[in-house]
Amino acid sequence: MKHFNIFLVAVVLFSACKNKEQKTTVAEEQSVPDFVVAFGSCNMSQEPNPFWDDILQENPDVWIWGGDIVYADTDDVDRLRSIYAMQDTVAGYNKLRNEVPIIGTWDDHDFGVNDGGSDFAIKAESQQVFLDFMRVPQDSERRSQEGVYASHDYEVPEGKIKVIVLDTRYFRSDLIEDEDSNKRYKPTMDSTATVLGEVQWKWLENELNGSDADFNLIMSSIQVLSGEHGFETWGNFPLEVEKLEQTITQSGAKGVIILSGDRHISEFSRAEVHGLSYPLVDFTSSGLTHSYFSFSGEPNKHRVGEVVSDKSYGIINLNIKDKEAEFKIMGDNGEVLQELKQSY
């Protein structure tokens, strides 16, 4: 019996060592990303956000607000400022802000009016409140320009990442209501209609043309590739979609990825663009505190996988050496709700 016990102990120790070796091998095979981006949109400051601790666990290099940071819907500047201040009191967000760089853009509800565009009366004042919340210095050029668009450059030992943040509100032309179907809006072929406005378009072209980054992420608060649902989307301005695709292609910029929000759903869209050597991905992540839980389907010819209608946030792991991006729709407690890998 004594000999049997010695044999059993030996087997257990051998198995433990073998398992340890296997785990080490698996861990070694898992590549550590060179740069981690976390982003999300549609956040009500008065509602619980379960994700701030999870986001920190991902150890992101940057957090990008995709718009609707707060739900203000007001032309009262003091009220707008007070609602932003409420978000600043959220403990989990404060911890994130103290540990991770935070950048981003606005959408309609933090801009100040649902589905709002260029005709919003206090857009200039709203811009300053937004920049205050984002802690943009008073002497920044962004304080004197029209619109909240900006670019941010990051460098790691393996390479460079550029994040281009667009403003799809300040200059956007009027939407056309669709009275002939159950959709809210319909596309316009008016060549003067715009999403970005002349100055921002020129700026975007310069940013992409002059970029030597290994990955170029474009944050658009509204979806770019999903354009059939009839809500807000670049698809309501098809000539602008064509212009964006041509701008990306002609620039020669590497690894262009589109991020978007707004819709209270999360999904991956992917399209082959003529002249572009890699597929264009639009990663929609929305929303953080509330979602389209009654979602029952909508067309999107570019969709990859399924729509996630649960609350979620987005993670992009960038591997510069392998020229690969891993996109993950994340739920609470580190749950991966859906993922997509793309080579560039």
Regions found by a protein language model. Give the residues of each.
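Sec-dependent signal peptide recognition
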Residues: 2-9
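C-terminal motif of bacterial Sec signal peptides marking the signal peptidase cleavage site
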Residues: 14-16
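Metal-dependent phosphoester/phosphodiester hydrolase catalytic core
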Residues: 18-344
